[in-house]
Curated annotation (Swiss-Prot):
<comment type="pathway">
    <text>Aminoacyl-tRNA biosynthesis; selenocysteinyl-tRNA(Sec) biosynthesis; selenocysteinyl-tRNA(Sec) from L-seryl-tRNA(Sec) (bacterial route): step 1/1.</text>
</comment>
<comment type="subunit">
    <text>Homodecamer; pentamer of dimers. Binds only one seryl-tRNA(Sec) per dimer.</text>
</comment>
<dbReference type="InterPro" id="IPR004534">
    <property type="entry name" value="SelA_trans"/>
</dbReference>
<dbReference type="Pfam" id="PF12390">
    <property type="entry name" value="Se-cys_synth_N"/>
</dbReference>
<keyword id="KW-0963">Cytoplasm</keyword>
<dbReference type="InterPro" id="IPR015421">
    <property type="entry name" value="PyrdxlP-dep_Trfase_major"/>
</dbReference>
<protein>
    <recommendedName>
        <fullName>L-seryl-tRNA(Sec) selenium transferase</fullName>
        <ecNumber>2.9.1.1</ecNumber>
    </recommendedName>
</protein>
<keyword id="KW-0663">Pyridoxal phosphate</keyword>
<dbReference type="InterPro" id="IPR018319">
    <property type="entry name" value="SelA-like"/>
</dbReference>
<comment type="function">
    <text>Converts seryl-tRNA(Sec) to selenocysteinyl-tRNA(Sec) required for selenoprotein biosynthesis.</text>
</comment>
<dbReference type="InterPro" id="IPR015424">
    <property type="entry name" value="PyrdxlP-dep_Trfase"/>
</dbReference>
<dbReference type="InterPro" id="IPR025862">
    <property type="entry name" value="SelA_trans_N_dom"/>
</dbReference>
<dbReference type="Pfam" id="PF03841">
    <property type="entry name" value="SelA"/>
</dbReference>
<dbReference type="GO" id="GO:0001514">
    <property type="term" value="P:selenocysteine incorporation"/>
</dbReference>
<dbReference type="GO" id="GO:0005737">
    <property type="term" value="C:cytoplasm"/>
</dbReference>
<dbReference type="GO" id="GO:0001717">
    <property type="term" value="P:conversion of seryl-tRNAsec to selenocys-tRNAsec"/>
</dbReference>
<feature type="modified residue" description="N6-(pyridoxal phosphate)lysine">
    <location>
        <position position="295"/>
    </location>
</feature>
Amino acid sequence: MTSETRTLYSQLPAIDRLLHDSAFLSLCDQYGHTQVVDLLRRMLDDARDVIRNTQTLPDWCADWAQEANLRLEKAAQSALRPVINLTGTVLHTNLGRAWQAQEAIDAVMQAMRAPVTLEYDLDGAGRGHRDRALATLLCRITGAEDACIVNNNAAAVLLMLAATASGKEVVVSRGELVEIGGAFRIPDVMRQAGCTLHEVGTTNRTHAKDYRQAVNENTGLLMKVHTSNYSIEGFTKAVEEAELAEIGRELDIPVVADLGSGSLVDLSQYGLPKEPMPQQLIAAGVSLVSFSGDKLLGGPQAGIIVGKKAMIAQLQSHPLKRALRADKMTLAALEATLRLYLHPEALSEKLPTLRLLTRSEASIREQAQRLQARLVARYGDEFTLEVKPCLSQIGSGSLPVDRLPSAAMTFTPHDGRGSRLEALAAHWRTLPVPIIGRIYDGRLWLDMRCLEDESRFMEMMLK
């Protein structure tokens, strides 16, 4: 060790001395003595590494309290940070999918603050069933005989198969063997559930006779899977749920359907593309229908199964149900969300997902133009700011082909360098409330469809 290195080491302060400083006393009050001491030890190690490698002190050694405060603030940030989603994808899987309605938020807060009647029957003063209240609501909305709630739709599909067809064959069209995000594949789920996949038809064409010919003494289910995240077009043929349900009745084999997204209202009345509805499948005679809570329904993450009472009873009594059941916060949020559907006239106002999906292009463009004018002074020296038409997407595998006309604020660097766009996007991601856009065609696009809190957006953009 050189004398210069020894001199630099000697300039590093002792932890005890730092802890008596008023700034560190304040940090100890805020973050706790243990956490501050642990941090100071790491900072000393960092400083020694810099000295050893560069023969200099780190710049932050000039103000240990300031550096400690910055590091503690960063460490204290939640891993689930609120962001401003301007990607153009409304139900963005990586950003948490559906926003919750205020009614759902209030219900969750109430469920967290005090004991609730999760599995308690007030009338009988004994044990109740956690799905009962929601089952009543779901039956009212969908026309089903009963319902079952689990923690997501993948779990719902697994439970349906395991409880009703384990050890048996499940007949599915080749064109419906979907894979969703995270490599969730229908054939893999069947294998995990103990079922044997029996493919029928071809990728683009499946006929009623294909299902009939596939049935044998070991057939447990006929299954329909809604291809919510892709579309097969052209020379195609598929057997609709009503026809498949008729085949099932004729052959005395239950028919189940995985809708994926699942919408409880006819979206076409709001000018949106039509999506299959659980109530339509129930009316057609499908025995069990599963769908998600946090996609088009606009609620919390949940897997919902509606259908025949006897088959729902099979699901409720299966050992997997306990492993996959939803907790009280999820059930509270889902119940509050479902109650909004009892007042359909106000649904597009109260349900954030529907409110965002139904925003008009004109209102989005007006908002973008108004905010752009206020941001030119901040960004105009380096970027050209324009408002351009764009197409939003629903996201989370819902209506993959359809796009929603929207408007975006775009940033184009004067010098044409893509690195400036990357740097700007990276800067926005470091903000206290990160702003997430997308880079495309030499511009950084901020699709304004999902922007509701303008004041917070402007506060972040002007930093």
